[in-house]
């Protein structure tokens, strides 16, 4: 334990993954000693933390032996304290404030804030005072503080992207969980992190590309926040000569907030991909309304007059082969997602084809877990109940693998549905980490349907990851929405659904 040693969540996640990768390590955590984390550690038998508080850094492992533990902890310490030994000027003090950091890097125009929620607004206000845009990675920021931050930023002509904004691509530079995408003419404004990643990677793979991707935080299009920052982002993209179409991405927004955001574009056409939302004539404030991310990307391509590849090739045949292998009692779909927006989109698709879907992040409150026997279930494994004391599953797939082992082998399971998210910040081989489990599920009699979110430029390699899944017997689809359709087609014994037009 290191009292008075704060490290941000991104660095903690990286250190946890690094320790977990060491031989002989069954579990690892690099965390701040918040009450919730201390309780989780105590549940694992690590209880002697003395007077630890939220500003104390804790490294912990469960190892096969003492040597393995020492080696893993050494690696975690090296990563967490590396910044203190790698400054260009070893005699230069590490900056303790935003102002000191700007003095060292005067050309900076964006600050990434990743501190505990109660302190996030203070840091973000400091960045605005220093003339910086803000990517606010932190969660648990009070709603009134978010509104105040965004009002101030708007008055200063700056963007506050967040809170909880994990993805942005600004001037070709990816921030947070981002992908290597080609430059193009589509500006993306997203209140959904993996939703932004899905549309930007689809547009890259279709040869279109993006100009900017601005994450605004999941609450921005709520009635309370009213689209404050999304409006400013749309105005900025509308004024950008390199942006020909604007794509708005969100889980169901407040309709009035969404309309004001769309109306903020005076010259540039807007497409709205609002998951599960409906509107008369399929239009919202004059913008085409798409109910899935796939549909949104297709609408953008058509607006630009660009061709869209066949998104259905071979899927009905693959679904038919999977149906032929199923025992009669297998009718359930089980989804295990690392991307929250992809999990939500899957529920939208499955609900239209199979009926109500149960989840820890449900479309309706009455569809919260536990689910009745045989009902479709989709889990967002990036939610707090699954990440407490351990890395996000996009960084460390081990937790998902364990949960799949527990829940995917039931005699009633027809299809297992999953995503693999590539890009900067994600695990170096996420498909490889779950391939063995997928092969075992297929051998046990169920189908596995997977989607790889990524591009050829991502460090993990899109083709490599797809091939790894296919070699394990997984049906791999060209979009996340299409994966949900294939799973539904298998469970319903209606293979043609896999290649049908969206419901």
Model-derived regions: residue spans:
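Catalytic-core regions of core metabolic enzymes
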Residues: 1-503
């Amino acid at each position: 334990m290191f009292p008075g040693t704060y490290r941000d969540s991104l660095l903690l996640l990286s250190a946890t993954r690094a320790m977990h990768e060491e031989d002989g390590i069954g579990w690892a955590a690099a965390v701040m000693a918040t009450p919730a984390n201390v309780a989780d550690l105590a549940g694992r038998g690590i209880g002697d933390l003395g007077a630890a508080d939220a500003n104390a850094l804790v490294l912990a492992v469960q190892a096969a032996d003492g040597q393995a533990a020492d080696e893993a902890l050494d690696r975690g310490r090296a990563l967490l304290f590396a910044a203190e030994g790698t400054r260009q000027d070893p005699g230069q003090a590490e900056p303790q404030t935003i102002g000191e950091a700007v003095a060292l890097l005067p050309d900076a125009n964006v600050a990434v804030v990743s501190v505990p929620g109660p302190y996030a607004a203070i840091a973000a206000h400091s960045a605005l005072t220093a003339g910086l845009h803000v990517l606010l990675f932190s969660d648990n920021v009070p709603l009134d503080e978010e509104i105040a931050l965004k009002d101030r930023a708007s008055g200063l002509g700056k963007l506050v992207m967040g809170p909880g904004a994990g993805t942005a691509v600004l001037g070709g530079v990816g921030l947070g969980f981002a992908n290597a995408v080609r430059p193009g003419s589509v500006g993306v404004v997203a209140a959904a992190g993996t939703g932004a990643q899905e549309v930007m990677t689809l547009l890259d793979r279709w040869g279109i590309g993006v100009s900017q991707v601005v994450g605004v935080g999941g609450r921005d299009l709520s009635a309370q926040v009213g689209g404050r920052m999304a409006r400013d982002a749309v105005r900025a993209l509308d004024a950008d000569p390199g942006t020909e179409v604007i794509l708005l991405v969100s889980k169901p927004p407040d309709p009035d907030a969404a309309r004001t955001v769309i109306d903020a574009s005076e010259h540039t056409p807007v497409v709205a991909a609002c998951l599960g939302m409906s509107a008369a004539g399929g239009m919202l404030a004059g913008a085409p309304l798409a109910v899935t991310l796939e549909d949104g990307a297709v609408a953008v391509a058509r607006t630009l007059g660009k061709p869209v590849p066949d998104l259905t090739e071979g899927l009905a045949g693959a679904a038919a082969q999977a149906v032929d292998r199923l025992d009669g009692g297998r009718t359930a779909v089980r989804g295990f997602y690392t991307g929250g927006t992809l999990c939500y989109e899957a529920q939208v698709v499955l609900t239209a084809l199979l009926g109500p879907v149960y989840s820890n992040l449900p479309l309706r409150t009455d569809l919260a877990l536990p689910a009745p026997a045989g009902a479709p279930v989709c889990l967002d494994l990036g939610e707090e109940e699954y990440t407490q004391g351990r890395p996000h599953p996009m960084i460390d797939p081990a937790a998902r693998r364990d949960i799949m082992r527990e829940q995917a082998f039931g005699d009633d399971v027809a299809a297992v549905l999953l995503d693999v998210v590539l890009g900067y910040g994600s695990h170096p081989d996420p498909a490889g980490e779950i391939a063995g489990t997928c092969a075992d599920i297929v051998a046990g009699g169920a189908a596995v349907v997977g989607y790889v979110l990524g591009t050829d430029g991502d460090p993990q390699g899109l083709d490599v990851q797809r091939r790894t899944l296919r070699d394990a017997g997984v049906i791999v689809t060209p979009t996340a929405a299409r994966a949900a359709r294939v799973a539904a087609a298998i469970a319903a014994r209606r293979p043609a659904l896999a290649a049908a037009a969206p419901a």
